[in-house]
Amino acid sequence: PPSGGKQLSKEEIEIIGNWIASGSSPAQSVAELKLDENLKSYFFMTKTNFFPDVKILAVDFEKIKELKSQKIFVSPINKSSNFLSVSTINKKDFNDKDIDKLLEIKDNIVTIDFSKSSITDSIFLRLSEFPNLTVLRLTDTKVRGEGIEKLSVLENLKRINLVNTEFDTAFLKSLTQFKSLEKIYLF
């Protein structure tokens, strides 16, 4: 295992093996690795009863294909669910207006990773329209926190990651209004 760390999981070892087999390019995106669906779901691991307990229709595959062509990674959270995880990690220029591309599938999205994107506080109003959003990652963005209270209407939001943001501590109190929030990552 890494010094002072935990042993890599079987999935992590397999992902690294795929990366090495495909040429080990540090610029290669997750989407370019062409991982098996079981390995893709590793990036969006779930625990029982973590996500909303509602039945939801599947999203048209053509819509997912369209988003992927725009470097927006979309994947089911597992094989038996119509819920989706969305990541813009490969689209650094994803901005506040680009969220409109996700509105058509907003009911299916439970996890969004906007890390290292170009979003700002303006995103909070639109995100408040995603009823099943459970995990929100805003790591390494320009988010300051103004308007974050708009997310308090999201009854399923359990985790927010605000690591390496410009989050202003004046907005911390707003987070106490969130009924389901279990964890906030902020440093």
Predicted regions located by residue number:
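A local structural micro-motif
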Residues: 27-28, 75, 183
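Concave beta-strand-loop units of leucine-rich repeat
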Residues: 48-54, 79-99, 104-149, 153-187
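Short secondary-structure junctions
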Residues: 71-77
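Aromatic- and Gly/Pro-enriched helix-to-coil junctions and flexible linker segments
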Residues: 1-66, 70, 84
